[in-house]
């Protein structure tokens, strides 16, 4: 299984960086993981910034990849449902997209085949990356019968 996570901006907090590195290391035992960071626009005009970031995100998507946008308005899964989705979604390779703190451009939303919500709560985009990697790790361990998930 191949999984890609594309995110806007660098992780600036060391704690988030360490957590992402740990879950990426764990995931590597079960899947080929590719982590891609695109530059945040840092433009005063947020609309222009979103468009620039949006194009950078779209440039990372390739034919045969299934774009999954992370957004609070998307579909929510239990960990077991996410594992089932990963197992039954083998036709295309999933690419999970985490936008900036300003969200994503409409063109990214239009390209996404699925929108996934981690929660009804809003998280900082750096923390969202940690949660995505942890949930993906949890999902692959559920599929492998590993005891990490106790639910």
Swiss-Prot record:
**Which InterPro entries does the entry mention?**
Alpha/beta_knot_MTases, RlmH-like, tRNA_m1G_MTases_N
Record keywords, A-Z: Cytoplasm, Methyltransferase, rRNA processing, S-adenosyl-L-methionine, Transferase
Give the residues the record marks as binding S-adenosyl-L-methionine: 70, 99, 118-123
GO terms (molecular function) for this protein are:
rRNA (pseudouridine-N3-)-methyltransferase activity
Q: Which CDD domains match?
A: RlmH-like (cd18081)
Q: What is its EC number?
A: 2.1.1.177
Q: Name one GO cellular component term.
A: cytoplasm
- Using the UniProt record, give the first listed, main subcellular location: cytoplasm
Q: Where in the cell is it found?
A: Cytoplasm
Q: Which reaction does it catalyse?
A: pseudouridine(1915) in 23S rRNA + S-adenosyl-L-methionine = N(3)-methylpseudouridine(1915) in 23S rRNA + S-adenosyl-L-homocysteine + H(+)
- Mind telling me which Pfam families this protein's record contains? SPOUT_MTase
Q: Which family does the UniProt entry place this protein in?
A: Belongs to the RNA methyltransferase RlmH family.
- Role description: Specifically methylates the pseudouridine at position 1915 (m3Psi1915) in 23S rRNA.
Oligomeric form and interacting partners: Homodimer.
Which HAMAP family does the entry mention? 23SrRNA_methyltr_H
What is the protein name for this chain? Ribosomal RNA large subunit methyltransferase H
The gene designation is: rlmH
């Amino acid at each position: 299984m191949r999984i890609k996570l594309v995110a806007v901006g660098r992780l600036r907090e060391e704690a988030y960086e360490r957590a992402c590195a740990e879950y990426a290391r764990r995931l590597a035992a079960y899947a080929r993981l590719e982590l891609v960071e695109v530059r945040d626009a840092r433009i005063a005009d947020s609309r222009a910034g979103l468009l620039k970031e949006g194009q950078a995100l779209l440039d990372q998507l390739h034919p045969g990849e299934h774009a999954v946008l992370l957004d609070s308005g998307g579909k929510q899964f239990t960990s077991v449902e996410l594992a089932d989705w990963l197992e039954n979604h083998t036709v295309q390779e999933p690419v999970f997209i985490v936008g900036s703190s300003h969200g994503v451009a409409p063109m990214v939303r239009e390209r996404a085949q699925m929108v996934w919500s981690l929660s009804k709560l809003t998280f900082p985009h750096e923390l969202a990356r940690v949660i995505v990697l942890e949930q993906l790790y949890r999902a692959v361990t559920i599929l492998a019968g590993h005891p990490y998930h106790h639910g």
